[in-house]
Every structure is written in structure tokens, then in C-alpha cells.
Swiss-Prot record:
It is found in: Cytoplasm. It catalyses: tRNA(Trp) + L-tryptophan + ATP = L-tryptophyl-tRNA(Trp) + AMP + diphosphate + H(+). GO terms for molecular function: ATP binding; tryptophan-tRNA ligase activity. A motif ('HIGH' region) lies at residues 11-19. Keywords: Aminoacyl-tRNA synthetase, ATP-binding, Cytoplasm, Ligase, Nucleotide-binding, Protein biosynthesis. This is Tryptophan--tRNA ligase. CDD domains: TrpRS_core (cd00806). The gene is trpS. Homodimer. GO terms for biological process: tryptophanyl-tRNA aminoacylation. Gene3D superfamilies: HUPs, Tyrosyl-Transfer RNA Synthetase.
Amino acid sequence: MKQTIFSGIQPSGSVTLGNYIGAMKQFVELQHDYNSYFCIVDQHAITVPQDRLELRKNIRNLAALYLAVGLDPEKATLFIQSEVPAHAQAGWMMQCVAYIGELERMTQFKDKSKGNEAVVSGLLTYPPLMAADILLYGTDLVPVGEDQKQHLELTRNLAERFNKKYNDIFTIPEVKIPKVGARIMSLNDPLKKMSKSDPNQKAYITLLDEPKQLEKKIKSAVTDSEGIVKFDKENKPGVSNLLTIYSILGNTTIEELEAKYEGKGYGEFKGDLAEVVVNALKPIQDRYYELIESEELDRILDEGAERANRTANKMLKKMENAMGLGRKRR
């Protein structure tokens, strides 16, 4: 039997090339070997201030992008968290298993609440909801970045505590740190990770950037004064970052690229790289624009919610029975 994998994704605006290469691309590959659930976690998103219309737009955009990069709704379940009420219900039950002290120790809570006088309680109780998201599906593996590892440890602790205190119903999930899908750095400062929150828009590439924008961004990317196309992370971080992007999107090795551009300057290298990026993103963009306003996208999300509800409700019933909630049904 296939193992189950669960991935929660925040609907937070545009998706960068770094997100795509570092995570999305790999998550999509996992669907072939696992029983996969991809959840757009809009209830987690509201732990920080959101504009209502913007949030709705971001949810739809993310769903369309996931499908555009290759998520197959026949193989994986793609759904929106708030369309499966069991998440919020199970989240409350997990809050009643969690201790305030362990929630206050979460690094993300400390970071986001630092210096803020008014902190919403949802920021503190975010991890029990995340635990519920994962545990409702009998998840075996959770592909997460290093930044979420602490939350996943807490999920494991809460599941074990619940199993011990009430009934042994939860599978204890394992962390699956994806094999490094290359860490893509800022085009403007190659010592920093590429991020859409960078105030300089030339520092990052989004999956929906137009060809002219892409060309401009790549041509203005920081390199060095040497003029030699060579991979050397330590001394040539800018060129090394561009070589990494080229090698992944152009399906070629870094050694082949070094040989190809030997004796040639950065101008030609950047021009060719821009072409490779444009060609790699074109099919993703075409599929995205086909989907974004379509009934097909709604149908896929409806079916995903239906499947997720079926699975999640079964586990929710087990949780309610274990805790003694509601009435005993025959």
C-alpha cells in the first residue's frame, strides 16, 4: 500500500522561481509514488492581516499554479483548507491536548510576535491546527523545509500524547526534508535566498513574469568583474546561482555549461539563460491562464474538497469518540 504524504501551502501572492525549484517541483514529483494531499492553508493565512479580495485571489492563483506545474488531480488531492470543516474542528481538539508553554516556545511565534503589542491568538495556536491538518489524513510523511521542522516535532508529540491519553488512532508522521532542490538565491544579492518579499523586484523571478521582464531581470543580475562562467559558490556566488538555474531548467550539467561558455563573456551567457527561463516557464504560464478563470479549476477544487472531506470526517469521528464528544451513535 502507498504511504500518505501531506503538504500544506500558504496562499501568499506570487510564487517565485526559488519556490518552484526548491519545493513545488519536488512535491509534484512525489505524487507518483505516494497517496498525496496538497492543501491550500487559507485558515493559517489569516493569522496575519489579510485583504479579503487579495486572499481569495491568492488562493485561486496558487491552485492554478500547482496544476500548471504538473499536479495531476487524478493522482493527488488538491483542496482548500477552509472547505474541509474537519480541520478547524480537529484543530480545536488538538489545542486541548497542547500546552501553552510548548506553543510559546515555537520559534515562528517568537519571531512574528516580537515587538508587537497586539498579537492574535491564532498565531500562538497555529501549530495545533497544523497538527490537525496532518493527522486527519493518516499521514506517514510530511515534506517540509528546515523552518517547519520544529512544528512537525510538535505534531508528533501531540499525536503521541493523544494516542496515550485517549485512544491509539493517529499515525505518527515522519519528517521528509526534500533532497535539496537547489537553493535559489536573490539575483540582486546572491548571498540571500530569493524571496518575493524583497523590496527590489529585480531580485526575484516569479512564475508569471513576462518574457521581457524575465530578460531584464536576468540581464541585470549581479555577477562579478571576472567575466569567467565558472561555478564557485564561495568566490562567484552570483554566477554560480545563474548556473544552477540554467542547469535545472535547461536539463544540463554545470560542467557542460562551463565548457560551453569557456572564453565567452557574461552577456552571451545571460542572454541564453533568459531564453532557457522563458521557454521553461511558457508552458506553465499557458496552462495557468487556461485554468485561472475556468470551470475546470472549480471542478478540480470541488472534487478535491469532496475527497478530503470523506477522509478527514472519518478521522474526526474517531477523535470525537476517543474524547467522548457528542452522542454515541449506532
